[in-house]
């Protein structure tokens, strides 16, 4: 605008010079032509008249000839002067120039305009830089949103995995319950078998006692029969002559003896208990026979009785052998009964332990259920988040739905495969049970029961080992939970500390807003005082006395400002007293005190400038009466410019406050999201640790199952050597066991792979947590920097708003200052030099205080480092060097 006006003025001056030159040239040509024409005519109508009159008439003719030219020149000059006046009006309305000779004022005005344009360009550059920074922050926020979406997808996958593992845990629990029921049934069977064994043992003991008594009686009878045999041999030798008579008698008594033998044999076939009675009868008969022998003293009877006793003796020897075998068997049964009792007792103790462990496992399953509930709640939360994300983009939701469907299909397929595997295992179990039953039928009941009890003991021992390992892992998990809780508490403390810092920053912002409102009120007050000054300028002659009153009012205002200074000094003293109690707020209070000191210095500068202006006004009253008209125009222009500048500044402040509020809201949202993400990641990390431990426990269980299967295989091989008949069935069972071993080894490998994947996921989550922590630190530093920059921009805007009217006043008052510069040049220059020195001293004091605080307070170095870097214009490399040198 101003450049165009200056160019327009130059063009007008050039055109004026050209027009004057052309007019003079045309007049010269006109006069020469007229004279030549008159000379050519030779004779004129005035020759008859006297020469004096002719000369006068010729002069009149010349005047008449020149009159239109002069008239045209006058008109042109008048038009040019009107144009110059219009130009002067425009310049006087838009610039502090009041006359054509005010070249220096025009130069000063254009220089001020150039400075203002430079300041505007700098502000535009600053705003563009801030805009670029905000765009970068928006890009980073978009990237963080994309990363969150990726994290959501990964979290959904992890939740799907957790649901699968939950189903597997449920199936394992069902298997454990089934195994428990089987163990209980086996215990009951073992108890029943033990009871049967006890009854058999008691029966065998009773039978053994009876057999002992019978053996003793038979031994006595044997001794007697041996004695009888010796006597019978002697009698047979004596009675060799009387055989004929002896043959007739035994033939008559043989049927009775045979009848007795038949009765004895029948008694043996019926019951073993009656055998003792018959033996007692035979012993009684023998005694009767012995009593008869001396009475009858017949040789035939003795021979018959000897033969009968031989037969009885042989029978008794056979029965003795059978009874000795039965005694050995009964002793073997007694030992087996004792072993079975001991095993039953051990089984009962192991059953008690297994029950306790099952209770613990049930409790663990309940905890797993609780974790599954939490996982379900997290799934619900994730679904809610997905619903929220549905508003943002339907494509992503469809993709997530497709992925969920795929995961569900995969889950269903895996469940189907697991069910098939369970069915296969159940079939294998049934086949093994049938094989075991066949082996039980083939082998003796007691041996099968003992083998069962041994297998159960091994199983219970393995389960005991597994449960002890689980307890150890549970203790380790408790320790890890305690450590994680400690870390969580520490992180919560850091979050609370950051929230307190945010609150402090909010309070500072409120105070800054209050200060901004105070500055606005001060601006309005200064505007009112400016209006009053304008009114006083219009009535300067009549209001000299009022001017003195204004002096007094300014003195009163100075007193008020001094009172305010005292109040602020008291506040500063109170803040210094509070410094010992609140070390964290020292930097903020210092900044506030420095701002207040700067405000006080600005106020003192204003007071000094006002006093100088009043002194100048007292000397320049007469000149201002002449320049009142021009000053009115200048004041109107200043008003309009001030209003426009104030509006622009208010718009800038509003835009900056809006941007700051937006940034603050975005940062708060980002911080909340990041805190939520960190908590979610911690929870997922804990869940993954629990899952890893569960998988390790599964690996251990599978290893124990493999060992059990190997033990079973070895036992089956041992039994195969003893039981040759069931070798084919044992081979089938061995094959099945080998297949189950292969499947279990495959499961072990799969579990190891899944364990490694979970470990890698855990490492990735830890890396993500570190990245989030670094981002959190970067965002906090950016927030501090943005707040510091906003406070600095406010301070600069305030100083600009306060300096702009003074600069306008200086430009407006430039004509009168030029007129006075000859009278008072030295004080003005000295005041400007003093103000510059004061500002430089203030800046140096501020930098000194910041550096001293940075060096003294180690805890606040992280907060003061961005301020020091902005003051000293340090790069990141310089900051690192500074920190390393301080360490």
Swiss-Prot record:
Residue ranges with Basic and acidic residues bias: 37-50, 145-210
Localisation? Cytoplasm; Golgi apparatus membrane
Compositional bias ranges of the Polar residues kind: 240-254, 808-822
Coiled-coil intervals: 118-241, 299-788
Protein topology in the membrane: Peripheral membrane protein
Query: Which keywords, in A-to-Z order, does the entry hold?
Result: Coiled coil, Cytoplasm, Golgi apparatus, Membrane, Protein transport, Transport
Provide the GO biological process annotations. Golgi to plasma membrane protein transport; response to endoplasmic reticulum stress
Q: Where is the composition biased (Low complexity)?
A: 788-807
Q: Where is the composition biased (Basic residues)?
A: 258-273
> Quick one: where's region Disordered?
16-50, 142-214, 240-301, 783-822
Domain of life the protein comes from: Eukaryota
> Which InterPro entries does the protein's record reference?
Golgi-autophagy_related, GRIP_dom
Pfam families reported for this sequence: GRIP
**CC annotations in GO:** cytosol; Golgi membrane
Stored Gene3D superfamilies: 1.10.287.1490
PANTHER family recorded: GRIP AND COILED-COIL DOMAIN-CONTAINING PROTEIN 1
Q: What does this protein do?
A: Involved in vesicular transport between an endosomal compartment and the Golgi apparatus.
Domain remarks in the entry? The GRIP domain may serve as a Golgi targeting domain.
Report what the protein is called: Golgin IMH1
Task: Tell me which species this is from.
Answer: Eremothecium gossypii (strain ATCC 10895 / CBS 109.51 / FGSC 9923 / NRRL Y-1056) (Yeast)
What does UniProt list as this organism's lineage?
A: Eukaryota, Fungi, Dikarya, Ascomycota, Saccharomycotina
């Amino acid at each position: 605008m101003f450049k165009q006006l200056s160019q327009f003025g130059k063009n007008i001056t050039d055109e004026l010079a050209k027009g004057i030159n052309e007019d003079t040239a045309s007049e010269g040509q006109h006069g020469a032509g007229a004279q030549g024409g008159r000379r050519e005519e030779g004779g004129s109508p005035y020759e008859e008249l006297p020469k004096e009159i002719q000369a006068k008439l010729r002069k009149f003719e010349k005047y008449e000839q020149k009159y239109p030219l002069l008239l045209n020149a006058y008109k042109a000059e008048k038009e040019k002067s009107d144009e110059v006046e219009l130009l002067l009006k425009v310049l006087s309305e838009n610039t502090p120039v009041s006359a054509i000779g005010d070249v220096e004022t025009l130069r000063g005005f254009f220089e001020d305009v150039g400075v203002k344009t430079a300041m505007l360009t700098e502000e535009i550059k600053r705003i563009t830089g801030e805009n670029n920074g905000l765009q970068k922050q928006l890009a980073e926020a978009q990237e963080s949103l994309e990363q969150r979406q990726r994290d959501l997808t990964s979290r959904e996958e992890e939740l799907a995995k957790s649901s699968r593992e939950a189903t597997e845990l449920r199936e394992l629990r069902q298997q454990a319950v089934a195994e428990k029921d089987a163990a209980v049934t086996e215990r009951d069977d073992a108890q029943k078998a033990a009871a049967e064994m006890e009854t058999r043992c008691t029966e065998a003991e009773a039978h053994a006692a009876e057999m002992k008594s019978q053996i003793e009686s038979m031994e006595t009878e044997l001794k007697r029969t041996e004695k009888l045999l010796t006597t019978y041999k002697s009698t047979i030798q004596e009675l060799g002559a009387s055989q004929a008579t002896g043959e007739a008698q035994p033939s008559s008594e043989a049927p009775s003896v045979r009848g007795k033998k038949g009765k004895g044999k029948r008694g043996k076939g019926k019951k073993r208990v009656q055998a003792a009675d018959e033996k007692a009868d035979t012993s009684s008969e023998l005694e009767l026979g012995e009593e008869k022998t001396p009475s009858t003293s017949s040789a035939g009877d003795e021979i018959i009785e000897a033969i009968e006793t031989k037969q009885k003796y042989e029978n008794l020897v056979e029965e003795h052998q059978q009874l000795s075998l039965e005694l050995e068997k009964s002793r073997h049964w007694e030992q087996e009964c004792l072993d079975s009792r001991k095993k039953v007792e051990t089984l009962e103790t192991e059953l008690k332990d297994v029950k306790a462990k099952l209770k613990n496992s049930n409790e663990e399953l309940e905890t797993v259920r609780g974790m599954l509930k939490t996982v379900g709640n997290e799934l619900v939360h994730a679904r809610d988040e997905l619903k929220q994300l549905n508003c943002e983009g339907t494509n992503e939701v469809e993709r997530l739905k497709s992925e969920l469907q795929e995961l569900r299909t995969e889950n269903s397929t895996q469940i189907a495969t697991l069910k098939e595997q369970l069915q296969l295992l159940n079939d294998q179990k049934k086949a093994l049970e049938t094989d075991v039953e066949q082996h039980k039928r083939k082998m003796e009941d007691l041996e099968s029961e003992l083998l069962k009890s041994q297998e159960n003991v091994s199983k219970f021992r393995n389960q005991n080992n597994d449960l002890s390992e689980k307890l150890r892992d549970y203790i380790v998990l408790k320790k890890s939970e305690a450590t994680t809780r400690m870390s969580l508490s520490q992180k919560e403390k850091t979050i609370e500390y950051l929230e307190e810092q945010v609150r402090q920053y909010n309070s500072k912002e409120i105070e800054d807003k209050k200060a901004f409102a105070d500055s606005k009120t001060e601006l309005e007050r200064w505007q009112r005082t400016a209006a009053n000054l304008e009114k006083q300028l219009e009535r300067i002659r009549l209001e000299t006395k009022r001017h003195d009153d204004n002096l007094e009012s300014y003195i009163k205002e100075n007193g008020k400002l001094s009172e305010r200074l005292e109040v602020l000094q008291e506040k500063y003293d109170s803040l210094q007293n509070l410094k010992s109690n609140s070390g964290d707020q020292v930097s903020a209070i210092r900044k506030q005190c420095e701002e207040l000191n700067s405000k006080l210095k600005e106020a003192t500068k204003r007071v000094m400038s006002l006093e100088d202006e009043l002194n100048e006004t007292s000397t320049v009253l007469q000149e201002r009466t002449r320049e009142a008209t021009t000053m009115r125009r200048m004041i109107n222009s200043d008003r309009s410019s001030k209003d426009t500048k104030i509006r622009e500044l208010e718009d800038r402040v509003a835009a900056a406050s809006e941007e700051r509020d937006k940034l603050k809201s975005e940062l708060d949202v980002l911080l909340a999201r990041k805190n939520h993400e960190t908590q979610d990641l911690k929870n997922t990390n804990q869940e993954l640790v629990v899952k890893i431990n569960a998988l390790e426990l599964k690996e251990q269980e599978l290893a124990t199952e493999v060992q059990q299967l190997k033990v079973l295989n070895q036992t089956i091989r041992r039994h195969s050597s003893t039981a040759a008949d069931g070798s084919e069935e044992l081979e089938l069972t061995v094959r099945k066991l080998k297949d189950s071993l292969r499947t279990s080894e495959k499961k072990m490998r799969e579990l190891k792979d899944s364990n490694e994947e979970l470990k890698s996921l855990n490492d990735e989550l830890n890396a993500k947590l570190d990245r989030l922590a670094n981002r959190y630190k970067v965002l906090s530093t950016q927030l501090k920097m943005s707040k510091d920059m906003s406070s600095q921009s406010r301070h600069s805007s305030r100083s600009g708003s306060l300096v702009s009217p003074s600069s306008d006043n200086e430009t407006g008052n430039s004509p009168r200052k030029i007129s006075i510069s000859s009278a008072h040049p030295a004080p003005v220059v000295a005041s400007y030099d003093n103000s510059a020195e004061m500002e430089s001293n203030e800046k140096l004091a501020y930098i000194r205080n910041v550096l001293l605080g940075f060096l003294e307070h180690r805890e606040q170095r992280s907060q003061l480092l961005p301020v020091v870097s902005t003051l000293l214009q340090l790069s990141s490399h310089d900051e690192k060097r500074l920190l390393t040198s301080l360490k």
